[in-house]
Amino acid sequence: MNTLDFVDQSSLRDDVPAFGPGDTVNVHVKVIEGSKERIQVFKGVVLRRQGGGVRETFTVRKESYGVGVERTFPVHSPNIDHIDIVSRGDVRRAKLYYLRELRGKKAKIKEKR
């Protein structure tokens, strides 16, 4: 095992649930404002998951007051408190960039049975 792999192995989180593109998730993010720390929930659809190991990231998209908001999180970040899976999506693509152009009911993802 390489030295960097050993360092990476110690930084990996073991409480990350199995989720993928199309799933609707609640990401509980630790936000530090001054001396206070609070948890902010970001709920949306996972557009992609890329990378591997410590460098693995995922992108979540949501509509907020008619404006699309995307946020990319490192999977093993210490700033993420935890991730809840709201629903599983039934999609055939690994990257759901086409959802950026869709509005309303067309942007809805079928739920996996």
Swiss-Prot record:
One Gene Ontology MF term: structural constituent of ribosome
InterPro entries xref list: Ribosomal_bL19 (IPR001857), Ribosomal_bL19_CS (IPR018257), Ribosomal_bL19_sf (IPR038657), Translation_prot_SH3-like_sf (IPR008991)
Biological processes annotated in GO: translation
Cellular component annotations (GO), alphabetically ordered: cytosolic large ribosomal subunit
Its biological purpose: This protein is located at the 30S-50S ribosomal subunit interface and may play a role in the structure and function of the aminoacyl-tRNA binding site.
Family under the similarity heading: Belongs to the bacterial ribosomal protein bL19 family.
Protein name: Large ribosomal subunit protein bL19
Gene name for this UniProt entry: rplS
